[in-house]
């Protein structure tokens, strides 16, 4: 009878709780801390539930508290294999920290670690189902200051942790699981993971995933595989420098702000983009292949890229190739850059570039370093025309500007096709141009570019309702909106040699000498009558934006004017001009 009573008593929660408290008290004395379990329920030795589990550290601060732990065991197999049906953890918190090079949980690790196990021997745990809900996790390394931005792996505060996993296998350092759901809120950075599903492996060597889906507040990411390789868990403390990526991403929506939380050097970025591609290597040297990116309303690019180390931009190698580009200026203005590249995070676009409205192109390459690189492109199209840069343009960084130099190919640096130059520079007298150029110059930014050397051929140049052809430019420059050059024109209706400059600041100031050997004025749309021709030597110093708005002086020598087979000759002439739409 006593035996039956004892067996029955053991099956009651009160007795089970009492026996568990004896064990808890023993461990409390052994560990010099407090371990407490408020209630225990055991059914048939294969199901057990613990309520109110409390573990304090050796300074009597709460290390862990769990409301309820439910465990259902299938069987215990010899050779250290535990086969568990289900573990359910409901509510609780873990408060871990490191101070003065000591972790507050180190005493538990020391106590339960086995010093007499053979090398390689361990306990394998097989778990069919794992459910965790309403859990909180804190970790602080008080020996290390907090980072001001992003996820700091030495200072974490996860709330609302929810985990649902199947086929969990734990063996020493290697952990495997099929994660059906994982969600949490990292309070310090603000990052919220709404759901993550995948087949995963976790170990000191990193995280390997298959069939990965990540849903956050701003991102939806789908990847057939995505791996983060490390030499130890400590590498996550230096995520950008030590964690190696290897993954493939199907078309996904990604928040660049959320990316910057994991790579703080990208702080300032805050755009939603659509992308797909393959990624390899570390964040600070990330290689992206077969990449497609869609941004804003109408912009996208396709190509292969090697992202630089933004902390060491001066020494980072650039190897970027855009196979296809379609970019609108309105979308470009919405891009927010890292603060390391722009103090206010914005791209400053010059008004002259805004007039292009869009840029389409293919086979665009950038190769080199921040201090010296080459840009080339098969063709770039815009609303106002197109250019070709097949031979590449060399840029060299100086103290506060970039020096760009003409190529040594002997052909051209830029070929211009049907460019509406007048619309681009907002001059109604000028129309479309076609030609090819070689040049060198200085670029301080997109709003401040000067061409110190310029040479080329203009096949077509539309000016004042006439399309001039065969224009050869040499010894040219465009500095501070002043165009200086020597020009030889061999048009069917105009033949001249020009030497001078045009100042496009405040009303177009022209200072030049011209040796005019032929000008069929009526064909050039500047003659008063038909069959009018002019030849002369000119010196001009005039200001004006067109023929109806000219002021200045013209000096002529050896002038010959022919009209209807009648000639008029004038050895010398000085003309003072003051003309407007209302008066001559």
Q: Where are these predicted regions, by residue range?
A:
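Tryptophan-anchored aromatic micro-motifs
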Residues: 127-137, 414, 455-456, 554-558
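Transmembrane beta-strand segments that form the barrel wall of outer-membrane beta-barrel proteins
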Residues: 179-183, 207-214, 286-293, 372-380, ...
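Amphipathic hydrophobic-ligand
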Residues: 30-33, 59-72, 144-163, 189-199, ...
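N-terminal type II signal-anchor transmembrane helix
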Residues: 1-31
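Secondary-structure transition motifs
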Residues: 31-33, 52-173, 191, 219-231, ...
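Short extracytoplasmic
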Residues: 29-52
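Residues on the solvent-exposed faces and adjacent turns
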Residues: 39, 52, 73-75, 91, ...
